[in-house]
Amino acid sequence: MDTLSHKTLSSNKISADKKWFVVDAEGQNLGRFSSKIAKVLRGKYKTNFTPHADCGDNVVIINASKIVMTGNKLEKREIFSHTGYPGGQKRITPKEMLVKDGTSVVRHAIKGMLPKNKLGAAILKNCYIFSLEDHDKEAQKPTNLNLNDLI
């Protein structure tokens, strides 16, 4: 590469250098954890970050069912959804979500921190969440990621 060139290089889906990371969610605060994962998925910490392209990394999250929420948010917070029919508003607490599916609370938090468009949906597909410690992504050889090293 020409180091004296004054060109701005823009990354795209093909030229993006995607890595695989594994992150342990046990004992982590949900909001701080999710915002750091969203930055890694989006690729915002990379020098060749491009807002309109999927240039982020793939993340494997283990122990998602052991995530922590401060205070009594686990019982008091309500997450709303709507079926699309009149009177079809549904409410569920994070505690009920964890009982139903151990990964849904983390997935919901990360999804809320990504763009609300087709790119956000594509980026979320790079996140693999498992409620326990075992996962099926050993073939990709993911490296451990310490979230405290990220800003």
What are the language-model segments listed below?
Residues 1-108, 118, 141-151:
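Ribosome large-subunit tunnel/peptidyl-transferase-proximal elements
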Residues 120-130:
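C-terminal structural segments of small proteins and small subunits
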Residues 42, 129-130, 137:
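Aromatic-residue detector
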Residues 106-107, 111, 124:
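Hydrophobic, well-ordered secondary-structure segments
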Residues 27, 132-134:
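Residues that form or immediately flank small-molecule/cofactor binding pockets and catalytic motifs
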Residues 119, 135:
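Basic, amphipathic alpha-helical segments enriched in Lys/Arg and hydrophobic/aromatic residues
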